[in-house]
Amino acid sequence: MMCLAFQSFHFIKKHLGNRKGYLSLPFVWLGFEHVHSNWEFSHPWLSFGNVFSVRTNWIQWYEYTGVSGGTLWIIIVNLFLFLLLKRWMNNEETKKIRILSGIAIAIPILVSILVKRSFEHSIEQEKRNFEVVLVQPNIDPYNEKFTGGPHAQTNKFIQLANSKITPNTKLVIFPETALSFSFFENEFHRLSIYPKYINAVQRWGADVLIGASTMKRFKNKRSKASRENPDGTFTEYYNSSLLIKKNLKNKYIHKSKLVVGVEKIPYSDYFPFLEDIAIDNGGAVGSLGEEDTVKIFKTSNGAIAPIVCYESIYPEFVAEQCRKGAELLCVITNDGWWGDTPGYKQHFSFARLRAIENRRWLVRSANTGKSGVISPTGEVISESKWWEEDVLLANTQLLSEKTIFSTYGDFLGRSAAFVWMLIFVYSISKKILPSRR
């Protein structure tokens, strides 16, 4: 896909000239990143703007532009540096390009400082404290996740939470697929572990957000994820967020952004045989069911956005949750599948960008790490270590003010994709029309 984007840039430059070609590059690449984030093979992990997740003081203006703004900054600076190097190698005047390069680097950083100060001043007027307990049980997904007994694991979860619960705790969060065995959603109350969670909720006076592997049965085939049963009914499996509230019906939200090749087989609607090559991740094999629309939970004390693992790398998905009223971002994940690689570190770091884009506190419960608490300015307030059992007490705030990015989403990416198509069509016309003369 990246090669196709550069091939498009090369084609435009060839037929419109160097000047227009280089001017088109930001539109080409931004448009590519936007398109790549919105098809069935989407993988926005590699978007250029993600690199600033470790330099959050430089990109506080992501609350306006999102990651696409960072991508645009990188492309513009690199274009200036390329032109500077080209002129220097040709012994041409470089003073103007050097000045422009310096301005392109400095202005966004200065703007970031001003934006951060402005936000920190405004947040003082909105203080609704919301205490959260984050549990990191550290269950080895390769050896314990699907073999440990549900009662033993439930007891462990509750004991860990007990160590940090206070009378002010509003929410307790357990990681993705903490309930790793599949069960029908309308039968959760019949499970032998159910009383343990209900008793804990009543004792704590706090709601529980927990990851679960769930199922639903349908009379008719609902989607490509529906599996036919011997009796002619259909079952769908889900990677779900489950909200357990005192004396109220349990609520479920299914993961919407599924991992390609593990939870979702791209375009299997058209090529059903592809379902047979799905990777076995220890649970249901093949495409999982997913939500039709973006949803949030209403807890007893405020609105939260349940973000399951891979969903946290999708800026527009999280922005839509905030548009729907989410006041706190809650990431649940099981990063143990990565092993001790840069993957889990990057995944944690990207969450800092979601906090800045939407100006929300973000709390993260990861099975094996890293769990953590991130402020609306992307600052890591506290974090756990990798592959260690831990519990964090998070003193956060519920925030409701919407940012430009929360309101309009990736407007830069959408606009760039549109302009890219126009430029590309125009360059095709320049190639074709001369041949007809």
Model-derived features with residue positions:
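Class I S-adenosylmethionine
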Residues: 108-111, 147-148, 330
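A generic secondary-structure signal
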Residues: 11, 87, 159-163, 320
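CN hydrolase (nitrilase-like) catalytic-core segments centered on the catalytic cysteine
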Residues: 26, 171, 178-179, 187-216, ...
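Membrane-embedded alpha-helical bundles of multi-pass enzymes
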Residues: 1-119, 339-340, 351-354, 366-374, ...
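Soluble catalytic regions of membrane-associated enzymes that act on cell-envelope
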Residues: 116-264, 293-300, 306, 310
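Amphipathic beta-strand/beta-sheet edge segments enriched in Tyr/Trp
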Residues: 231-255, 370-395
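Active-site catalytic loop in hydrolytic enzyme cores
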Residues: 16, 37-68, 195, 228-315
